[in-house]
């Protein structure tokens, strides 16, 4: 849980007795601060003090659950994913989504360049993959300042099946970009047969 102090409405009334908090970096008020679970996988003696040098001894991850029912659903999904019964050409599809940035933050094209570098690396290393690019600036902006066609394209691609979806840009815990092209509500309301790996 990211809210170690319990100040957000999201964690009000949550029992803390069985919560495993994230590791928080020392520079917690700095722009270089971060939260990670990697710390819990540094099992060698004297490891864990240098994250760029130390090696994790096992893979770690979290299930965002609060109930036994949610835990059962997540375990069942993981087992299904690992059994790899849902094979098909969808596993050759990868999508890169890039924010447009703006003049105020001077990131006008940085996100697209970063996403393009990743996409080109995939195309070079794995030529069998079909790389989809959803870059905001390639779509029409609505009069409300949003990108409805970007949202629709992401949804269409997810329904067709993606091995990976990578987002490069600004966002928060509840949405991608200040235009909110993909939100927590979208995720909560979605149900896709093919489960991609999400990278943001």
Give the ranges of each region predicted by the language model.
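Cysteine-dependent hydrolase recognition
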Residues: 1-200
């Amino acid at each position: 849980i990211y809210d170690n102090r319990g100040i957000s409405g999201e964690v009000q009334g949550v029992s803390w007795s069985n919560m495993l908090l994230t590791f928080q970096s020392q520079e917690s008020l700095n722009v270089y601060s971060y939260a990670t679970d990697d710390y819990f996988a540094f099992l060698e003696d004297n490891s864990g003090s240098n994250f760029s040098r130390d090696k994790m001894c096992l893979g770690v991850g979290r299930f965002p659950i609060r109930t036994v029912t949610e835990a059962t659903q997540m375990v069942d999904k993981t087992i299904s994913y690992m059994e790899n019964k849902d094979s098909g050409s969808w596993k050759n599809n990868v999508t890169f989504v890039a924010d447009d940035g703006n003049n105020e933050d001077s990131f006008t094209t940085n996100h697209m360049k970063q996403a393009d570098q990743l996409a080109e690396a995939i195309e070079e290393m794995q030529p069998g993959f079909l790389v989809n690019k959803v870059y905001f600036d390639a779509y029409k902006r609505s009069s409300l300042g949003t990108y409805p066609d970007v949202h629709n394209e992401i949804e269409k691609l997810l329904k067709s099946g993606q091995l990976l979806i990578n987002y490069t840009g600004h966002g928060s815990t509840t949405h991608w970009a200040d235009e909110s092209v993909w939100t927590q509500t979208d995720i909560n309301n979605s149900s896709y047969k093919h489960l991609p790996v999400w990278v943001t």
